[in-house]
Structure formats: structure tokens, C-alpha cells
């Protein structure tokens, strides 16, 4: 019987060897598919009979034939999945297919390179920036030279992954170009030097437009004439022009402008720079110009490192540190810090100026804007100097305010009646700035607040216009002027002038017509000769009789009890008719730092003694001061009387008619009206021999027509504030320290004047 298994196996092996040798190299199959399929197909057909001799011989022959391609084949085998070790026949077929694919891909690559070179040769466009393409968008001609940006493939043998990527890129080159980010085709930036040269003229132009006439010439170097001989352009491309203020001729260079300016100058007044053609008629202009040549900037800002050549530029620069816009348009929302820019706005649009603010943000109705005039900065309504420090000129604000003080009394002499609110507000700008620890000069036309310690009566009597109601200085506005450099952030939005006018209107409304007549008569009856005699007499008394501070109590107990018995309805009202000769004027040598209260009471007695001699004549006589005729004539006030147990009763408390008599900001004139009104209603108990008697009871109560009978008014002489409530007055006086009235009695902090104390009380919590 024939063995079919042996025969079939032998025939199959021979057929398989013949099939592999003839057709394996010509059949194209995927490596994985060929590997798996051949492995699966051949594994079940494996015969248990060993038949590996034919395969080993065939593999040895193939290795000898392709020995020169062994190195690239090793690389491909390392990057591709290796076939199974059990199937050597599948490995042989895989190697043959991979070699054929590699050859085809190399041919495709060569054709691609040739086509790309030919395309680049026929369709080459110049690269660079296209002005029609917006920055950041793809260039429309980018696809023509985009291929040049990629490295060309090398003809050397490459891996399978690289070849596959090149083939994919060839088939979808347009898609890749659409997906790749666009190249940066924005134009190159200008050099830093040119940009700085464009910005510098604009900056200098801004300084010229905002500063004074002293800055109309920009900085030029000593050895470079391009800035003065060539036109200057700003960053917007606008050329700088130089316009003659005399004839209106416009020049485009500084040299031409200076040459034209010389024609308007007198030959004997021409001042020329030794280093350039600059000419001027003013010495300070030439001085500033020479400082620019030498690069000297002596003026420096105290808040930053800015330096400049003159004070005007520094004042203009300091406005950049302020948040107050002093100039506002009445017809629109335009606001600026510089008057020059404000005038340009008003001229351009035909608008009207609004309320001008001071440097601290306080409205100043006394200033007006001369829109079409040549004045730099605002001007005052009365034609006098400017009372605001924000005009941009070189002079300081303090000198302007002191000059206005000399003009104000002349205008107020012609206004005996109550002025309107605008005039009252405008009068606030005319008071000098006097420190709280210094005595004003005797010839000062207007006196400050009663915080000045040593004032002579001569300074009061030398001002015939003092009793005018327009001179009643509101305390808050005056104190702000004394401390105009302080930052009062909570009070920036307050119209302080309106508040002051309301206070004055309320005080003037309480005055009787007879008081106004008396004040007018007092102005008319004073003469220069009498003032000189009175000045000499009072100066002699002030030197001979210094203030006695050795008294233990400010008020005698008997007199205080008598005052309570005679005035039970007003136990806390202090009648200012109560001074004696024992505490006369404060010495004019300013030896004692009294805050003005003794001066006020002493002047009261002198004025009252003159009224007792002639009741119709309300002026200070030159006779010796008689004894007091008040119920508490023996009272000796102390500087620190508010620290005693009777602080609320012993402090300076006045009625409304006393406030009317306060014709100046000092307390001396304030008490003069009180004494004149009270002495005219006295019962004749005032005699020159009763100075030591403290039991006079003739003038028991004030007249029924006086405001003291209607209601009590308490006044703090240090802050010049009135209180209608004794509790509020006592609380306020509790903040004044005994040794220093402007030192907080609660925490001990030293404050800068009454406004500083008020700000301290408002900002800090005290237990």
C-alpha cells in the first residue's frame, strides 16, 4: 500500500520552494499582511519531517547577492517590526518587497526635486515686504517662494519614516501651506535714534505751550546748529512754527525768527548770546538761554528728579504732581491745569471760562480769564495783581496776595453797606499770609486772625476802613490761605467762599442800624494827627505795663458769684466789658507769646474809656485808661484760662454785635464794638477811681436790645469760631492744650495752626 502522507509532503515542499524562488520578488504585499498571512498559512502546513535544508541554502545565496546593501537594510529593520524568528521564509519575502518600495520612492523623490526646481525657475518672485498685505496676515505670493524656506531633501538613503513623510508632503503640499503659520512680513521698525529725535521736539513743544514766555526757545547744543538752522517736526509730522508777537510774521527756523525779532528791538537794548544768534531785550531771558548752553538746571522738583533752568518751568512742572484742574470750561467738560491751553480751547471753540480754582482746589471768583489778551495767566476782577498761584508766571503766590491786601481797603471804603456775596468772596483773596507766631508790621492795612500774639493798638487805628462789613474775614477761608500748601483732601469739593459769605451774611443780619451808624461815624471821625498821638501813647503803655501772668485765677470768686446772681439766665456768657488796668497791653516787643486775647480785652477798656468821655465819639482817646466799670472789673485773665475749672465761662464768649465790631480779622477790633455798644447803655457807674473794686452792680445785665439777652454765643479766640451751644464749645476747647493752644490736648500732637488742629481732630480718633 502506498504511503500518501509521505508522498504529499514531498510534493508540497518541492512546489513551495519553486513558488518562492519564482514569484516572491514580483508580488507586492504590505509588510504586516505578508508577514502575518504567510506565518499563519505556513504554520499549519509545517511538516514534522525536517525540511529546512532548502531554506537555509536559499537564504545563504540571498545574503551573498545583497551583501553590499546590508547596511541600509539593517537600518530599515531597526525601524520596522521584525518578523518572527520561526518563519525565515516570510523574512525573505519581506526584504524583497521593502527593497522594491525603497527604489520606487527614490525615483519619486528625484522627480519631485526636478519638478520643484523647474517650478522655481519659471515662477520665481522677489521676496520681501508687500505693502498691500496687512501685518500678521499671510502674504498672497508666499506660496511661490514658500518652498524655498524648507530644506530640500537629500539624495542619500533615508529611513522609511522620512520617505513616507516626503511622499505625504508631495501629495498635500497645498494643505500644508494653508495650515502652517504665516511668516512675519511686518515692516522693520525705525531705528531708535530716529524715533527719539522725533519725540524730543514734541516734548519740547509741549513745554513751550504750557510754560511762560521764558521757555519759547528750546534747548540746543553748543556745537550743533541743526536745531536752530533746520525746521523741526514733531512725531505727528507737523512742523514747528515761530510766530512774531509784534507783527505776526511766521518763521520756520530759529535763526530766521531771531533775525526778524532783531528788527523790532532797539539797538541799545539788544542782548545777544555769545555762542549763537539768539537775541533778546531781557536779561533774565539771556540768563536762561546761557544756562541751556551750559546745561545748568538749578531748579529741581521736590517730588521727583526733574530739573529746569527757571522757576516758571518748575511751577509748570509741579502741576503734573497735582490732581487739581484749575481751569474748567463753562460750556463743555474740558478741564486743564495750564492757562495757556485753556485759552487756546476758548479761542478755538468760542466757549466761556468757568470758575477758576486755586492750587488747593478752592473756587476763586475774583480771578477772570483774559481770553484774547496777552496776559499770561488769569487776572483779578479789580485790575490788581493776581491772587492765585496757578497762573504759571514766575512770581510767587504770597507776594501777589500781599499786594492785593494793599488794594482791598481802598475799594472797601466806598462800600459802607453790606456787599453782595461775590464781593465778600472776592475780599477773601486780599488778606496777607501771617504766621501764627509772628507779629505783623504796624503799617499793615489788614490784620490777620487773632492768632497773632503781640499786636499794638496802633496797627488797628491806622486802618480807617477796618469797620467796613466787607472786611469781616471768614475764619475758614483765611486759615486755608495761611496754610495753602497743606493737602486738605476732604475739603477740595467745598465752596469755601460761599460758606464764608453765608457766615458773614448771618452775622450782619443780626446787627441793628444804630451799630452800623456808629461804625460809620467811627471811620469818619478818625484823623491822622489823632492816630499818631494815640500810637505814641499806646506804645508807651505797652512797654511800661507788661502782661502779668502771675495771677492764680482768671476771675475773682466774688465777681463770679455776682455775675451768676445778676445774670441767672446766662450763666456761661462772658461779657467782654470786663477788663482792668492791671493787665494792660501786651508788650510790643513780642516778649510774650500771647494769642491775642489780652490785647483784645485791653483795647476794649481803652475804647470804652473814650466812649465814656464822649458817648457820641466812637474812637480811642489819648487820655490815660480809667478804671473798669463792669460788674467784674477786677478780673485778671490768664493765658491758659481754658485749662481751669471755669473754662467754658472764662473763655472769650461774644454776642453777635461783638462780631460786627470785628472789623478786621484780629480780636482787638472785635471787642471794640462790644465795648462801644455796652458803654453807651451803661448807667453811669464807670469812674476812674474804681479800678480795684469788684462789687459794682449797677450794670447788672446787658440791655434788652442786645443779642446777648436773646442767646449766648461762645467764641474760641484761637480758632475764631462761634458756638451757640456751651457743650460743643467745651468739647472744642478741650482739644486746646494748656502749654500750646495748637497742640492736641488729647494725644499731644503739635498741629500747624487752627486748620491743622481741625484736620487732626477730624482724621484721628480720640478716646
From Swiss-Prot:
Keywords: Developmental protein, DNA-binding, Gap protein, Metal-binding, Nucleus, Repeat, Zinc, Zinc-finger. One of its GO terms (cellular component) is nucleus. It holds the Pfam family zf-C2H2. SUPFAM superfamilies: beta-beta-alpha zinc fingers. One of its GO terms (molecular function) is DNA binding. Residues 105-117, 518-527, 661-704 have a biased composition (Low complexity). This is Protein hunchback. Residues 39-51 have a biased composition (Polar residues). Residues 200-212 have a biased composition (Basic and acidic residues). Residues 30-51, 105-127, 174-212, 357-424, 518-570, 610-704 are annotated as: Disordered. Residues 528-537 have a biased composition (Acidic residues). InterPro entries: Znf_C2H2_sf, Znf_C2H2_type. It is found in: Nucleus. Gap class segmentation protein that controls development of head structures. It comes from the Eukaryota. A zinc finger (C2H2-type) spans 242-264, 271-293, 299-321, 327-351, 714-736, 742-766. One of its GO terms (biological process) is segmentation. The keyword Repeat applies. Residues 386-397 have a biased composition (Gly residues). The gene is hb. Belongs to the hunchback C2H2-type zinc-finger protein family.
